[in-house]
Amino acid sequence: MGNSMKSTSPPSERPLSSSEGLESDFLAVLTDYPSPDISPPIFRRGEKLRVISDEGGWWKAISLSTGRESYIPGICVARVYHGWLFEGLGRDKAEELLQLPDTKIGSFMIRESETKKGFYSLSVRHRQVKHYRIFRLPNNWYYISPRLTFQCLEDLVTHYSEVADGLCCVLTTPCLAQNIPAPTSHPSPCTSPGSPVTLRQKTFDWKRVSRLQEGSEGAENPLRVDESLFSYGLRESIASYLSLTGDDSSSFDRKKKSLSLMYTGSKRKSSFFSAPQYFED
């Protein structure tokens, strides 16, 4: 009934099961509710809410920042999965959220594309908000650049969080992440998203580069360590150095210095491709 607020005693309330009360049960507030023209807002744009129940068009939710509990219509919120996958918002609302005062460079979200049904868009905060279309292959793999394919969206986010690789910047934190309170318990080191990787390896001896021979085992892995211990960006930097310092017979010759490794989510392939192509949404 117009702008009237939802009754606090709904006739039918569907509590969410324990299996639903997970990471996906968050809502991002897209606009102040209720409107300031009617009464002081209970929930403000940019707040993240935990879902209590779903009533078909209305949500009963509690704010993660203020602790206030109330009802809010579905048109005023977007559903959030994994902290960065937003469902139910368009390009304009995505830009509004990414341009909130506390949002930093590199903040991002993935959302359903408005212009291409069945595809997704990656929206990133930089000097301005940039949008990149995410394509889906027939085998359900994803890519932004055709030379880099990923088995799932999580792998795509992980890769571009390590290296920009053609994007406007590296992905840093999901949009509105600052509105989620810090956990009270100590997270596991292997699951903490902000834990830096520390390598306990011998210092690399650059003099060994000149002794590398084409086709030798050392040329394949001059560090003689597991490649998985090094980030993609570090390995690419080493490859670039080798291409600049190696002689004509080196496996890393000069003509390869502008090329990069293909990353495929769960696998890394040693095939070389030309510079990436990106399609802005």
Curated annotation (Swiss-Prot):
Location (main, coarse): cytoplasm
Region (SLA C-terminal): 190-281
Ranges of biased composition (kind: Low complexity): 7-20
Pfam families: SH2, SH3_1
Subcellular location: Cytoplasm; Endosome
Additional record remark: SLA deficient mice show a strong up-regulation of TCR and CD5 at the CD4(+) CD8(+) stage, and an enhanced positive selection in T-cells.
InterPro entries associated with the record: Grb2-like, SH2, SH2_dom_sf, SH3-like_dom_sf, SH3_domain, SLAP_SH2, SLAP_SH3
UniProt name for this protein: Src-like-adapter
Lipidation (N-myristoyl glycine): G2
Keywords linked to the UniProt accession: Cytoplasm, Endosome, Lipoprotein, Myristate, Phosphoprotein, SH2 domain, SH3 domain
Domain SH2: 84-175
SUPFAM superfamilies registered for this protein in UniProt: SH2 domain, SH3-domain
Gene assigned in the entry: Sla
Functional note: Adapter protein, which negatively regulates T-cell receptor (TCR) signaling. Inhibits T-cell antigen-receptor induced activation of nuclear factor of activated T-cells. Involved in the negative regulation of positive selection and mitosis of T-cells. May act by linking signaling proteins such as ZAP70 with CBL, leading to a CBL dependent degradation of signaling proteins.
SMART domains: SH2, SH3
Subunit structure: Homodimer. Interacts with phosphorylated CBL, SYK and LAT. Homodimerization and interaction with phosphorylated CBL occurs via its C-terminal domain. Interacts with PDGFRB and EPHA2. Interacts with phosphorylated proteins ZAP70; CD3Z; VAV1 and LCP2 via its SH2 domain.
GO cellular component annotations of the record: endosome
